[in-house]
């Protein structure tokens, strides 16, 4: 990339900072949740919605981001994304109640949903095709550093300042990013087809209402009749989308995607698999802080080995899948992740804290292998004319399943916690133990889906071609 013009390199730096802000924010909040609960006068069992409100908003808004960038221009949308994300961060820091914080996180999510896909689109437009991979490697590197720094930085800020600072640090970075975007980034536009607003609204209502119904079943004031009504509305919205998308060339996601068996299996497995694995980044720091008295900073440090294991495994996952095949790798890593989850719980309950970093490192390795395999299995056999639509649907499903996973984790904590009157340390650990056992069972379930994957090892060379689009 040394032969690129200075202006292009500056534009890549802008995109890289956007990736960093978005990836940092997805992990920095986790270690601060118990402190937020105490400050806002809420039960820690309700704080999962701080994560869900952000991730669910990202899932809902993702389908519109690419169309908006083509229609309005990448500079205008990227600038808007940074401004919304920064304003959301400010409102998060100023929040005095949980409801205010949830609304601010949703505003952040609107910005976050546009930041990464529009950033990818920007790189495609400003960099020659032969240098695209090198440019994407450059701009995504800060996105890999964000999860590494996020938990420890969040714990450090909470312990030595306050939880408000995990949002305030976004403001100067966002201001600089917004100004440089206006000054340096060209406003590329493309001719677009008419946006499928009806399909977008049906999907948005279906996802949001079903997630709300799932969370409402935890005893948050919804009556059984209201929950049943929400479920009915959500199901009807999704069924209407399926009817709307039939033989509709303008549909957000073509139903032709599901004619490819590996896409259908991969998408179903990704949805079920990320529900289970999406619980872990939320539950682990909460488990360590509330169950065992770890400080926020110490709990954040414990997350670093998991990220390191994930990053290290990415270098050899292609060789592993090509050697053993998708079916064996996905079944083994799914069951392995369930076992590692039980190992983490057992190690913590026995008080072997010095072993926890090694267990978390192993968990990161297994999880990374499964993620990469799920992504590439889903996309590898799609025809070129459906690859972009399939990738967008996979991205949306990834965010949606993570929000459902965090919601279910909060539901399990509330369910087991409500069965105990006392709040001594032994009871708290018992509640977490039952929750962890349930999580391990949920994590193992997608193995039944992956067992149906064709044993086509000779086709696994496609992983090297599709991996870039699935990141």
From Swiss-Prot:
It is a multi-pass membrane protein. InterPro entries: EmrB-like (IPR004638), MFS (IPR011701), MFS_dom (IPR020846), MFS_trans_sf (IPR036259), Multi-R_MdtD (IPR023721). It is found in: Cell inner membrane. Residues 1-11, 70-76, 125-137, 186-196, 246-262, 307-341, 417-430 are periplasmic. GO terms for molecular function: transmembrane transporter activity. The keyword Metal-binding does not apply. It comes from the Bacteria. The chain crosses the membrane at residues 12-32, 49-69, 77-97, 102-124, 138-158, 165-185, 197-217, 225-245, 263-283, 286-306, 342-362, 396-416, 431-451. The keyword Metal-binding does not apply. Residues 33-48, 98-101, 159-164, 218-224, 284-285, 363-395, 452-471 are cytoplasmic. Pfam families: MFS_1. One of its GO terms (cellular component) is plasma membrane. Keywords: Cell inner membrane, Cell membrane, Membrane, Transmembrane, Transmembrane helix, Transport. HAMAP family: MFS_MdtD (MF_01577). Belongs to the major facilitator superfamily. TCR/Tet family. This is Putative multidrug resistance protein MdtD. The gene is mdtD.
